[in-house]
Amino acid sequence: LDGQVAYVTPVVHNGQIIQITGKYVFGTDIKTGKIRWTYDFASAFEEKERREISCVTPLVDGQFIIATRGYNHGTVLLELAADGNSVKPLWKNNDLDTQHGGTVLLNGHIYGSTWINNSSGEWACVDAQTGRTIFMQPWQVPGKDGKLIPLGKGITIAADGMLYQFDDKRGTLALARPGQDNLDIVSSFNITYGTKEYWACPMISDGVMYVRRGDVLAAYDVKAK
């Protein structure tokens, strides 16, 4: 395949490795290494300035594959054929264009951040069945003086029906409750340790959330009480 490499973790599904490059979403047979299918993701949307940089692992749910990336590129839902040899696009959404980390599928909705520029974005919710944008909202948290501080874009993960959002520029980590037309920020705090960017995706295992920044790794108890 031609095109730029990507910063994406592959997904293993039904005997295939599903992956994204700068140009394609594609599936590779685990046993033979043969490429079973490709989808021209780079040409799926029209951008004024095309940047074939993919940093978001695809979401796979049964025969459905959700692919997104930043830079005004948007999100597409693909349906994998029963024989595993082809895909077809079911819908495209121009609002949800997550740049870093990931999006999540929760109760039939896709949650993630949008890309306005490399320092800012909003948080969005998209209907997974129709591709309709349900809401988009700025992310704001209370400052020390009680005034709301606008934050940017970043990473979204989920556990126990709640969303954890990690701002990739300022290091703010927030717990959010998804609602019908917005996200309700329950609590938040800032990651102050480590160095450089906040690009590592937090992970949750057995009620413990692991957060890395640079050469420092921290663990937090996030079990539902």
Regions found by a protein language model. Give the residues of each.
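Noncatalytic, solvent-exposed loop/strand surfaces
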Residues: 1-225
